[in-house]
């Protein structure tokens, strides 16, 4: 069984036991969270697509860690002016483990 969930403006395909890094959530480490925005649920040959979400379907997960991704470097040039601007960005994330997928 697997599901497609929406969180942080992105979509993720998840199965029980998966560990993934998603956009930062305001939850403490060890807390259990529920994702109610389930877009699709697949159980063997039975496929349930939501319009836009599957009714009464939830995915439960446990928050394992919070952190920051690797730095993304941004460089802006102005041609022929000997001008260069360097910047960097590190996005915050929450690492979660999928514990249950249910309807």
UniProtKB/Swiss-Prot annotation:
Keyword list, A-Z: Ribonucleoprotein, Ribosomal protein, RNA-binding, rRNA-binding
InterPro entries per UniProt: bL21-like, bL21-like_sf, Ribosomal_bL21, Ribosomal_bL21_CS
Keyword flag Ribosomal protein: yes
Molecular-function annotations in GO: rRNA binding; structural constituent of ribosome
GO-annotated biological processes: translation
Entry superkingdom: Bacteria
PROSITE patterns xref list: RIBOSOMAL_L21
GO-annotated cellular components: cytoplasm; ribonucleoprotein complex; ribosome
Transmembrane segments: none
Subunit text: Part of the 50S ribosomal subunit. Contacts protein L20.
Name used for this protein in its record: Large ribosomal subunit protein bL21
Organism: Legionella pneumophila subsp. pneumophila (strain Philadelphia 1 / ATCC 33152 / DSM 7513)
Name of encoding gene: rplU
